[in-house]
Design a protein with these regions (language model features):
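Thiol-based oxidoreductase modules, predominantly thioredoxin-like and allied folds used
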Residues: 46-61, 69-80
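Short acidic, S/G/P-rich loop/turn micro-motifs used as interaction or catalytic elements
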Residues: 25-28, 57-58, 101, 110
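Thiol/disulfide oxidoreductase modules built on the thioredoxin-like
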Residues: 80-119
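Typically the conserved alpha-helix immediately C-terminal to a functionally engaged Cys/Sec
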Residues: 28-43, 108
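N-proximal helix/coil linker or "cap" segments that precede and/or mark the start of modular domains
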Residues: 1-2, 12
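Short active-site neighborhood of thiol/selenol oxidoreductases, capturing the structured segment around
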Residues: 8-30, 48
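C-terminal soluble domains/tails of integral membrane proteins
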Residues: 24, 31-32, 80-84
């Protein structure tokens, strides 16, 4: 179980979820969060999205949420975990089903969400 702001304790091994790995200061991460928030507002069946934040610089979660018009359940991860999870560079999103990784997305997040979840 992972403790998330806005959601309390969440079992990432249960059900279907998406988990984004974002660096608070990363412009690509901010852009992805903005696009996903817009997509969520336009969709009736957007899946649960949880964010694991790494804080490298001075940007706070509150500032990130204001910049991106987004607010997702979030938790902090340390530098080693962040680099283990992001691959070559952030952002990265994991699609999980029953705790197993169904897909890993490093770009084209909106189209992956639309195709995978048949968003309307």
């Amino acid at each position: 179980l992972t403790q998330f702001e806005y959601a309390g304790r969440v079992d990432l091994a249960a059900g279907e979820k998406t988990v984004a790995i974002f660096n608070l200061d990363c412009e690509h991460c901010q852009e992805a969060a903005t696009q996903l928030a817009e997509l969520e507002r336009a969709s009736t069946n957007f899946p649960k999205l949880y964010v694991l934040f790494y804080q490298e610089g001075s940007t706070t979660v509150s500032e990130f949420e204001q910049l991106t018009a987004s607010a997702y359940p979030n938790a902090f991860i340390d530098m080693n975990t962040f680099f283990d999870l992001i691959g070559n560079s952030p952002p990265r999103i994991y699609h999980l089903k029953a705790g197993k990784v169904e897909a890993i997305w490093d770009e084209d997040f909106v189209s992956h969400y639309q195709e995978t979840f048949e968003l309307n």
